[in-house]
UniProtKB/Swiss-Prot annotation:
This is Lactoylglutathione lyase. Transmembrane segments: none annotated. Its EC number is 4.4.1.5. PANTHER family: LACTOYLGLUTATHIONE LYASE, LACTOYLGLUTATHIONE LYASE GLYOXALASE I. It comes from the Eukaryota. Zn(2+) binds at Q31, E97, H125, E171. It catalyses: (R)-S-lactoylglutathione = methylglyoxal + glutathione. It is an enzyme of class 4 (lyase). The active site is at E171 (proton donor/acceptor). The lineage of its organism: Eukaryota, Viridiplantae, Streptophyta, Embryophyta, Tracheophyta. Keywords: Lyase, Metal-binding, Zinc.
Amino acid sequence: MAASESKESPANNPGLHTTIDEATKGYFMQQTMFRIKDPKVSLDFYSRVLGMSLLKRLDFPEMKFSLYFMGYEDTTEAPSNPVDRTVWTFAQKATIELTHNWGTESDPEFKGYHNGNSDPRGFGHIGITVDDTYKACERFQNLGVEFVKKPDDGKMKGIAFIKDPDGYWIELFDRKTIGNVTEGNA
């Protein structure tokens, strides 16, 4: 890697296009989806533990599933008309779609969903920025949240990983120290 080139430069990232296609100018990351076993448990976690709001709920009775869109938006600004509320929800950035297939919450045979962190590996985690990783983790500990990694565990100090009720991993880092955590790799 050339010293004058940043790690983000096209010279250091074969395949990276520098001219963004005009047709994609309005695109943005809107959501990621988790399949959940029990909406009562997951909604409690994402709202009470992580502080998200329910932006929109969509039910599909014919197909027996519901979608719960969670995010950090101020819902007092959301339209009350159901169609307008859906349009508003899909205009928000970085939301989580919780998908519940009806009946899984009471099915004793249901084993849960694969979170991507065991073989075969795939999806890994989502990331949440917090004001202070240590204070957030102390709160999560008091709430009984399961940890994958606490802030001082392992080689990367100051970041943590928790699990949601379905075993999906959530990385936690704070905006004040994330630059220091990744400094040697920047």
